[in-house]
């Protein structure tokens, strides 16, 4: 089944220095901003979008775990529309585009919106032992941002293989 897929336009999420101007902005707000700008520039009515696919490595806010769905509803997509969040390390945004194209190619969507973004400035410190009660000794906190940079496959390898 061959079908032409068209990328109608695109906007990027804002880009800033770690801990500076974007440190207080939730990931879903960044997703909403780029999705809304893309829809405006392409003159697409949000109610016509069937699916939003969002790529993200480090969900740093309560609504960051499903930032794509939050953004979909924020921009005015139908409640019946679908959303999906993908994590493929550094290739998450690229995977979002691929997955959105697959939604169209398989007939699951006529119009799909794809994007990706991070806000590492909002990454927290984690203590995995405290939930179940640490018994003794020092209980250090780990920087979740470091997890993203030091994943077991090395920074950037996922994108190379997509």
Question: Residue spans of the language-model regions?
Answer:
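Short glycine-aspartate micro-motif
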Residues: 7-8, 110-114
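Acidic, glycine-rich active-site loops and adjacent beta-strand->loop/helix elements
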Residues: 11-14, 55-59, 88-92, 116-121, ...
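Conserved small/polar residues in nucleotide/adenosyl-binding loops
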Residues: 160-162
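Conserved active-site "lid/cap" helical segment
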Residues: 1-57, 61-71, 75
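Generic secondary-structure signature for well-ordered alpha-helical cores
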Residues: 1, 13, 39-44, 73-80, ...
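Conserved catalytic cysteine-centered active-site region
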Residues: 25, 56-112, 141, 146, ...
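Glycine-rich, flexible loop/turn motifs
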Residues: 11-14, 18-21, 80-82, 121-122, ...
């Amino acid at each position: 089944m061959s079908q032409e897929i068209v990328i109608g336009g695109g906007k990027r999420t804002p880009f800033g220095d770690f801990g500076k101007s974007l440190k207080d902005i939730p990931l879903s707000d960044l997703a909403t901003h780029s999705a809304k700008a893309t829809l405006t520039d392409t003159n697409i009515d949000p109610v016509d979008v069937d699916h939003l696919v969002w790529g993200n490595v480090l969900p740093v806010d309560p609504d960051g775990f499903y930032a794509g769905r939050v953004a979909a509803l924020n921009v005015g997509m139908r409640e019946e529309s679908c959303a999906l969040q993908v994590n493929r390390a550094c290739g998450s945004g690229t995977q979002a585009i691929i997955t959105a194209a697959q939604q169209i190619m398989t007939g699951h969507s006529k119009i799909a919106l794809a994007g990706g973004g991070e806000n590492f400035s909002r990454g927290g410190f984690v203590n995995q032992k405290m939930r179940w009660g640490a018994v003794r000794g020092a209980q250090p906190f780990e920087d979740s941002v470091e997890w993203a940079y030091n994943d077991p496959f090395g920074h950037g390898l996922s994108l190379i293989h997509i």
